[in-house]
Amino acid sequence: MAVLAPLIALVYSVPRLSRWLAQPYYLLSALLSAAFLLVRKLPPLCHGLPTQREDGNPCDFDWREVEILMFLSAIVMMKNRRSITVEQHIGNIFMFSKVANAILFFRLDIRMGLLYITLCIVFLMTCEPPLYMGPEYIKYFNDKTIDEELERDKKVTWIVEFFANWSNDCQSFAPIYADLSLKYNCTGLNFGKVDVGRYTDVSMRYKVSTSPLTKQLPTLILFQGGKEVMRRPQIDKKGRAVSWTFSEENVIREFNLNELYQRAKKPSKAGDSIPEEQPVASAPTTVSDGENKKDK
């Protein structure tokens, strides 16, 4: 079973992987991740490269390069233990492969290392990971419409994701959140999103830090009666997010989505709302209102 499970998951993901490979971002990222392998193993690229092998073969890895690659494999396996989606697995592989490539190229020749770093910087500046464009029942807010919508009908419960397009965690969570909206959206339970990377005043108003150091993105907030009831991740006294895994199971359990969904389909009754959560610290496919995915 230990072998069959990954194979089944791989076969199940083949259609999605094939769509990824057709996109320039993933093609170029895969090429950069395999750059050292191509340079070291493919003639005539490998001819004339320095090597520490006893046989002097420049087209094969020396012992130090093998050690670095083995260390890379161990790091990727440890990081992927906490990954939830295929996107997170692939993203970890690409990120740590590029770090290993930079080390290997600098070890080979400082000029090759500088060239590789330059290519990576150009790639980061010119290529952005594709946004999730699948089916969803999510309303996208801007800095003006979010307050209006929360106050418009206080009988409606809202779950709002505060995200930024540059955040890898937000991109990985996008298909999970979309799937939840398809399963649980109803008249009394709605799902929304707001880009706090674009609307910084919203991030300040709802106390969601966009700094990568705080790890507060994405943030999910449950609103009932127009007021915040709970959020994940919670914030500690230093303003940093308490570690929390954004999996579908965790969101359903923590936000009581099954109960909220059943309650939202019935006429509202007094005392139906979830009691407001005590904070850890005092730290502070429907698109409307002119917002759409391509605008973000």
Curated annotation (Swiss-Prot):
What is the predominant subcellular site recorded for this chain? endoplasmic reticulum
Q: Which residues lie on this side of the membrane: Cytoplasmic?
A: 126-296
GO MF term list: disulfide oxidoreductase activity
TM segments? 103-125
UniProt superkingdom: Eukaryota
SUPFAM superfamilies for this protein:
Thioredoxin-like (SSF52833)
Motif Di-lysine motif located where? 293-296
Instruction: Provide the assembly information.
Output: Monomer. Homodimer; disulfide-linked. Occurs in both reduced and oxidized monomeric form. Oxidative conditions increase homodimerization. Interacts with CANX. Interacts with ATP2A2.
Instruction: State the protein's name.
Output: Thioredoxin-related transmembrane protein 2
Instruction: Name its species.
Output: Pongo abelii (Sumatran orangutan)
Which gene underlies this protein? TMX2
